[in-house]
């Protein structure tokens, strides 16, 4: 069956089974010659024949060197035994003790090495019988050597009956020795996917992100992936209805899961910089569910992340929102019914400031050009919409005589923005560009949902609020390139004080595992309250992603995306004990 899967079956699928895929009279002379049985673990392909022409892959050793020899070297004589398989020879030198020898033969070129009391002896020679050559002793002296055969290797002779029995034998029985399988097939993969549990947390400090705030010595219950009760009284009413696993949270803190608004984990090669607009590409087509960073970020309390296209062009690709369901396939990682997003970008990256002298061709090359890319794209999208609108109004007979407009996946995505069906998250730094894009959006009839990074957001907070944009920034990143020199660690707190929905993001696989510490910096530098700072990585990114009705706080009916902390979640000394 395995052989047919490689030969006759694909030949049949390709419609060429009358000439290929089997060894029969009249078929094309395509076959391979092997050293051992076809599926032997140590088999080698010796020749590959294509249309009757042989191509040598691994030349077969012409001479069998196995046997008994005498080694003459430096005035001494030693017995030498060469054994093993023809393609994998072993040798032994016999003196007072038996010494293992490395013996390699490639046709008539011989290489020998062994260890004596002084170190390594290396010999190189040629021939069949005798073998002659030069070598270097362990003391560094060069000498000649001679190897003379005493007795050849006695091959096992098989009878005609034995050969016929082998040829006429039935199919080989393949044992299922693959062992246990898990997914992902990497470290920390599951043998069986974990089931949703009924869990009751008691005596724990709750960070609710609701009007109740932080509640000490409280309780919370979850069932079938949902929060079913919050608070001691509510839990008391239902504690006997289900078989809960009870977790004593004394001294511990329970919060909603961390949400990373800007991530690039579980992706690879998703910076389509070949053109100024690549809105047709989708991160959901490139997700790698076996990325170990999913597991690591779960260990840091992250439960949801928005996977973004890179920032190589003004209009990038479509985003993907995932839940960190380690061990699931791509479809199960994707967040159900999430509002679709697309990545935009401004600044040095899109005008190719640091791309080198050979990247001076693609438009735009200036910040002025970036603005025109946006206008050009959305004007084309509106014209595209008019063409399709006119086409849809035609009768069936008119459509037969006419020509249907060309389908454009790039413009389809931009149309979704104009119709309010898709949101934008935009890579941004400088106030002038942030202001420019808001003006473009206002004039074209759409809104920028999120300015991400936005390190000069504190300069344009009033205009952002008037436009209706949110902010997903870094806590204290600064001076890693020229356009971020005006960044300040107070930015997040100032934006929050202005009434703008503000979040902290990672943009980095390692940073995401410590987003709780990033949130703490809003308290340290900006004077934000602990509860507001905690919302920067939980409720506020949920609002920016339009999923706050399902997650981001501890409320009855919301998803049980939870993190149990060993201590205060904003402390650098606290660790994640459990993530749900």
Label each residue range with its predicted role:
Residues 28-61, 204, 555-580:
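C-terminal cap of metal-dependent C-N hydrolases
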Residues 100, 212-255:
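Histidine-rich, glycine-flanked metal-binding segment
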Residues 18, 38, 44, 50, ...:
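Polyanionic/metal-chelating signatures
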Residues 39, 136-180, 184-185:
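Edge beta-strand at a domain terminus
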